[in-house]
Amino acid sequence: MATKFPSFNQGLAQDPTTRRIWYGIATAHDFESHDGMTEEKLYQKLFSTHFGHLAIIALWVAGNLFHVAWQGNFEQFVLDPTHVRPIAHAIWDPHFGEGITEAMTQAGANGPVNIAYSGLYHWWYTIGMRTNEQLFQASIFMSILACWVLFAGWLHLQPKFRPTLAWFKNAEAQLNHHLSVLFGFSSIAWTGHLVHVAIPESRGQHVGWDNWLTVLPHPAGLAPFFTLNWGAYAQNPDSLDQVFGTAEGAGTAIFTFLGGLHPQSEALWLTDIAHHHIAIGCVFVIAGHMYRNTFGIGHSLKEITEAHNTRHPNDPHKGSFGISHDGIYETVNNSLHFQLGLALASLGVATSLVAQHMGALPSYAFIARDYTTQSALYTHHQYIAMFLMVGAFAHGAIFFVRDYDPEVNKDNVLARVLGTKEALISHLSWVTMLLGFHTLGIYVHNDVVVAFGNPEKQILIEPVFAQFVQAAQGKMMYGFDALLSDPTSSATIAANSMPGNHYWMDLINRQDALSSFLPIGPADFLVHHAIALGLHTTALILIKGALDARGTKLIPDKKDLGYAFPCDGPGRGGTCDSSSWDAMYLAMFWALNLIAWVTFYWHWKHLTIWQGNMAQFNESGTYLMGWFRDYLWLNSSQLINGYNPFGVNSLSPWAWMFLFGHLVWATGFMFLISWRGYWQELIETLVWAHQRTPIANLVGWRDKPVALSIVQARLVGLAHFTIGNILTFGAFVIASTSGKFG
């Protein structure tokens, strides 16, 4: 038996070429393809990896806590969170000369330091942390937690503690556990922390390990809870002139429904946040008691899905609704790829919403005034959402190749989707062309007339429908008089009749960037449709890749070729680029394109509002040269001056990263615009030269060098393209924002 890598594939381990190494790495996590893998073993291995994942997260969190406690300035930040720039960690670098050492000695530090743009300081401050000692304690706790979950991962691989396949496939038990215990209890536990620690700290009352059992979070204690007088917990909220972190203007309420932002911290009211978490927690605990499990009460998922059926005797829609769902329960419950696809899609949407809401409804005290952090967090979460969404479709496609059973799904809703794929794909194609030609056409028209000195001839379209939606939520500036912007509407009367004070109208109608609905005009209308083009094109490529995964008119037996194949054999020209993997690979370029437009839009619009110069976005955002000149070029200028012959400033590391990001990005094209034959010939030439150079022959190789496969080379190209893209734009966002606002 071969002992070479990879041990999980003995056939590959005996491959005499370097293909062994690259294919081994490529399939290391494709547990399904490993030698001797059974379904039960597969589930057990995956379950164990979850604990490893949790350990990595815990160690990462511990590292952040430890370095800030050791090298940061958290206690100074607590004293003045709007002016003290948070320090991520110190820098030790032997290359640092006097100039850069001086430039990077910032934020009151004694030596070179990195500034934190993660928002962690604001989060720790908001949840009631105040000292470095507390950060150290949290770091130690997270390190212990990491060890504990690593042990749990190892334990669940031992014969006595391996869960059975039946346990993994008990969908109802799994749903109940995740809903009630993981979501429900954790939300209620977090409410407990907010009520017992964070809210008292925000009112100047310290709660620690020494007194947390003796300090009542509310003067009335639990009496209102047991007497069902829950409204007592909402009475006497913090006043509008409360100073965050002190007793000045503080109330006693713990669960409120105030809406809007705390006037001083410019974040959501902590008592509103606590109310949100207790409500969510209760909803999830109830949801986790809905499915039939140990006691035989509750819903069966199989019965629920199969009742969605026009042939069902109790169908209330008399055959007009609910195509057969027979087989859907088995299909989802037996396919890890289907489940992963659903999970990734859900998480992708949630992550994108987090990006939006961190800016529109900031929940951490004073974070809204840290413009660089806000820009970094928005960009970070939108990029993550993009990766998750593409991953969702990738695993959807793998499901169709590996797990889909036409017999189980005969004539059900999934089979109907496959059966109508031509209509779905062609409609998406039509939408992308309509969006692309019209949006680009208007942009280019506007460029031409501006270039020829007639800016008044631009086509400028007011987004009236979007403005109406904003007005319906209470935005007054458009004069639409709809729902909440109409003082006589039933919505306004209902809102005004609610007891107590409420501040969401103040938030919506703010004049600064903190308004939850920023004013919009023709520039927003155009970029909105550009983003819609990116979304629909990415979706088109992904959906086509998944729905065509099993076969097409061109390649009817595609499912037998697998998820990733370069071409359909040497005898069939014109079949390259047709595997589902290729569709996901091609979609990544559009996804990166799209997410750049999304983040460009958010960043430029906010930069102009923060600078008090919104007219720049409104006027320059209606034509392409305006975007290139007044957003990209203008905001790159500080960056490219991070270092020059006359010296350096604190932006120089970002300037270098900006340059390096371009290099990594451009390197991607070397792999993307070449095929395997070129590299194979080059390698053979280098081998020839090596063998004819006496001194070089002192070094040999066990594996015969061969070029990467077509698919692997594409992956290498895409990886460089993606990482370069992110390095470049990340450096641009942070440097262009911090260069203006610190």
Curated annotation (Swiss-Prot):
Family, similarity comment: Belongs to the PsaA/PsaB family.
Binding site for [4Fe-4S] cluster: 567, 576
Domain of life, per lineage: Bacteria
Its EC number(s): 1.97.1.12
Top enzyme class: oxidoreductase
Cofactor detail note: PSI electron transfer chain: 5 divinyl chlorophyll a, 1 divinyl chlorophyll a', 2 phylloquinones and 3 4Fe-4S clusters. PSI core antenna: 90 divinyl chlorophyll a, 22 carotenoids, 3 phospholipids and 1 galactolipid. P700 is a divinyl chlorophyll a/divinyl chlorophyll a' dimer, A0 is one or more divinyl chlorophyll a, A1 is one or both phylloquinones and FX is a shared 4Fe-4S iron-sulfur center.
Binding locations of divinyl chlorophyll a B1: 662
Taxonomic lineage of the native organism: Bacteria, Bacillati, Cyanobacteriota, Cyanophyceae, Synechococcales
Quaternary structure note: The PsaA/B heterodimer binds the P700 divinyl chlorophyll special pair and subsequent electron acceptors. PSI consists of a core antenna complex that captures photons, and an electron transfer chain that converts photonic excitation into a charge separation. The cyanobacterial PSI reaction center is composed of one copy each of PsaA,B,C,D,E,F,I,J,K,L,M and X, and forms trimeric complexes.
Record has Nucleotide-binding as a keyword: no
Annotated GO MF terms: 4 iron, 4 sulfur cluster binding; chlorophyll binding; electron transfer activity; magnesium ion binding; oxidoreductase activity
Gene Ontology BP terms: photosynthesis
Described purpose of this protein according to its UniProt entry: PsaA and PsaB bind P700, the primary electron donor of photosystem I (PSI), as well as the electron acceptors A0, A1 and FX. PSI is a plastocyanin/cytochrome c6-ferredoxin oxidoreductase, converting photonic excitation into a charge separation, which transfers an electron from the donor P700 chlorophyll pair to the spectroscopically characterized acceptors A0, A1, FX, FA and FB in turn. Oxidized P700 is reduced on the lumenal side of the thylakoid membrane by plastocyanin or cytochrome c6.
Residues binding divinyl chlorophyll a B3: 670, 678
Spans traversing the lipid bilayer: 46-69, 135-158, 175-199, 273-291, 336-359, 375-401, 423-445, 525-543, 583-604, 651-673, 715-735
SUPFAM superfamilies according to UniProt: Photosystem I subunits PsaA/PsaB
PROSITE patterns the UniProt entry points to: PHOTOSYSTEM_I_PSAAB
Membrane topology: Multi-pass membrane protein
Protein name from the UniProt record: Photosystem I P700 chlorophyll a apoprotein A2
Reaction catalysis annotation: reduced [plastocyanin] + hnu + oxidized [2Fe-2S]-[ferredoxin] = oxidized [plastocyanin] + reduced [2Fe-2S]-[ferredoxin]
Positions that bind phylloquinone: 679
Organism field: Prochlorococcus marinus (strain MIT 9312)
